Curated annotation (Swiss-Prot):
Record region (Disordered): 1-107, 311-346
Keywords: Cytoplasm, Tumor antigen
Name of the protein this chain belongs to: Melanoma-associated antigen B4
GO annotation terms (biological process): negative regulation of transcription by RNA polymerase II
Tissue: Expressed in testis.
Cytoplasm listed as a keyword: yes
GO cellular component: cytoplasm; nucleus
Compositional bias (Low complexity): 92-101, 318-346
Domain MAGE: from-to ranges: 109-307
PANTHER family in UniProt: MELANOMA-ASSOCIATED ANTIGEN B4, MELANOMA-ASSOCIATED ANTIGEN MAGE ANTIGEN
Organism: Homo sapiens
UniProt keyword annotation of Cytoplasm present: yes
Entry-linked Gene3D superfamilies: MAGE homology domain, winged helix WH1 motif, MAGE homology domain, winged helix WH2 motif
Length: 346
């Protein structure tokens, strides 16, 4: 191969490698400026991405911004390959257009998913089944070919966020109802309408975990607002939301609601309650988050390490608890034996 062509080939390969590394750095690592501005920037990105996915109840991938033509040219380290750069610019432009179209469709499907979820929640509140034909009317015929994908995402959101499973009750008419996954269900329709009082609990515990095991009240409301749940506005499923999170779940010891120390004016925060610690774990919550994000727990490395430490501490605590129980039982038995012997006549 002539030397000039070899030089062009090497330059092109170098540009491609540089672009790939730059894009990886954009996605996986904060810049030096970002680190200086916020030492926990990577944790913040992780928290925001997971919270958004949790709120929408459907898997969402971090959106990668393709490198701009000017940035790619600046990193190319060549000044003579004008033809190659022109071709690269055309490819980049085509790639950006394709990405924009895909993102637009994804946003539209997300909106249709949220509309259908709200419709199904209304039907649930009214104790009415719905049909596939009605659901198609909600999303409009334009998105008919995407109905299977929308239906899957709707099912996932109602299941994960609201504790309601979408079940087909009549295959002939394609009729569906939302069934509580938390209440008793013996198969008849009346018990299927049981209100899932704690359906919001796992998402709330997840938000607290994502915020360093202690979430400010405004962070909780920000998350609830993304779900269409607002302070002072009665919700179709959960009723009065403030009462639910600051009284009901607190009285049931799933949540703790306390004033932030030294806050003036007073501000409040949420933590896991003792019952939440007893009935679930950070690993279970992380598995829930992973399911929402359609991934595995170890893809959240910082949270995964914390969850593993929590599992180890729990495993170490179990033998100590068992030992204490054994000691208590032995002491109690000894006391009973002593009491019995002392009561015998000499």
């Amino acid at each position: 191969m002539p030397r000039g062509q070899k030089s062009k080939l090497r330059a092109r390969e170098k540009r491609q490698r540089t672009r790939g590394q730059t894009q990886d750095l954009k996605v996986g690592q904060p810049t030096a400026a970002e680190k200086e501005e916020s030492p926990s920037s990577s944790s913040s990105v992780l928290r925001d991405t997971a919270s958004s996915s949790l709120a929408f109840g459907i898997p969402q991938e971090p959106q990668r911004e393709p490198p701009t033509t000017s940035a790619a040219a600046a990193m190319s380290c060549t000044g003579s390959d004008k033809g190659d750069e022109s071709q690269d610019e055309e490819n980049a432009s085509s790639s950006q257009a394709s990405t924009s179209t895909e993102r637009s469709l994804k946003d539209s499907l997300t909106r249709k998913t949220k509309m259908l979820v709200q419709f199904l929640l209304y039907k649930y509140k009214m104790k009415e089944p719905t049909t596939k034909a009605e659901m198609l009317k909600i999303i409009s015929k334009k998105y008919k070919e995407h109905f299977p994908e929308i239906f899957r995402k709707v099912s996932q959101r109602t299941e994960l966020v609201f504790g309601l499973a979408l079940k087909e009750v009549n295959p002939t008419t394609h009729s569906y109802i939302l069934v509580s996954m938390l209440g008793p269900n013996d198969g008849n329709q009346s018990s299927a309408w049981t209100l899932p009082r704690n359906g919001l609990l796992m998402p709330l515990l997840s938000v607290i975990f994502l915020n360093g095991n202690c979430a400010r009240e405004e962070e909780i409301w920000e998350f609830l607002n993304m779900l269409g749940i607002y302070d002072g506005k009665r919700h179709l499923i959960f009723g009065e939301p403030r009462k639910l999170i600051t009284q009901d779940l607190v009285q049931e010891k799933y949540l703790e609601y306390q004033q932030v120390p030294n806050s003036d004016p007073p501000r409040y925060q949420f933590l896991w309650g003792p019952r939440a610690h007893a009935e679930t774990s950070k690993m279970k919550v992380l598995e829930f988050l992973a399911k929402v994000n359609d991934t595995t727990p170890n893809n959240f490395p910082l949270l995964y390490e914390e969850a593993l430490r929590d599992e180890e501490e729990r495993a170490g605590a179990r033998p100590r608890v068992a030992a204490r129980r054994g000691t208590t039982a032995m002491t109690s038995a000894y006391s009973r034996a002593t009491s019995s012997s002392s009561s015998q006549p000499m």
